[in-house]
Amino acid sequence: MSQARFIAFSDGSALVNPGGPGGTGFVVLDRARPAYRFGGTRWVEDGPNAVTNNRMELRAVLEALEGLPGGEQVEVISDSRYVVDALSRWIHGWRKKGWRTASGEPVLNRDLIEALDARASALSVRYTWVRGHDGHAVNEVVDQLAQAAARGVAGPGEAEVVAALRAEAFLAGGPAAPRSSRA
């Protein structure tokens, strides 16, 4: 785990892949304060940008990065190898090749990848992959937030987010809970 000021956990879900509906979930921890925010969004899209798991994963990262102050270090933690590889490895070659893959095909989800690249350019972002459904408490919470958003139902609340952050030692236990906001 890096010493970044912000730790952003994200996950996406598509109930039907492709076609949706889909949902996003995120938790962002500001370790300098300490404070956190969390949320999720339901998405229904069709046409060339129809809901897919990968689009929801990318949207979740974009939502997590929104509003972070420029110049700050951020570690994005995702259980999506696609997100981590696309944003930390493949993007450099895609830009050089005019947004074409190694096989010459157009890059899928280019709109979201370019939006994330623009947002990340104002920050110092490191992408870290974790195995999903493998005991990472905060990753489980963002998964639940994404699935609940996709279904249009209430997801985990503040108590569950705090418990997950404490379980992974991102927050100290005790009576004084950090400030939060639900996006």
From Swiss-Prot:
Residues that, per the record, bind Mg(2+) 1: 11, 57, 79
Keyword Protease on entry: no
Subcellular location: Cytoplasm
Positions bound to Mg(2+) 2: 11, 143
Primary location class: cytoplasm
Every RNase H type-1 domain range: 2-151
A GO cellular component annotation in the UniProt record: cytoplasm
One example of a Gene Ontology biological process annotation: DNA replication, removal of RNA primer
GO molecular function terms listed in the Swiss-Prot or TrEMBL record: magnesium ion binding; nucleic acid binding; RNA-DNA hybrid ribonuclease activity
Cofactors, names only: Mg(2+)
Keywords linked to the UniProt accession: Cytoplasm, Endonuclease, Hydrolase, Magnesium, Metal-binding, Nuclease
E.C. numbers: 3.1.26.4
Record text on cofactor binding: Binds 1 Mg(2+) ion per subunit. May bind a second metal ion at a regulatory site, or after substrate binding.
Catalytic activity: Endonucleolytic cleavage to 5'-phosphomonoester
Record PROSITE patterns: RNASE_H_1
One Pfam family named in its UniProt record: RNase_H
Function (record text): Endonuclease that specifically degrades the RNA of RNA-DNA hybrids.
Summary of subunit composition and partner proteins: Monomer.
Family (UniProt): Belongs to the RNase H family.
PANTHER family given in the database record: RIBONUCLEASE H1
Designated name of the protein: Ribonuclease H
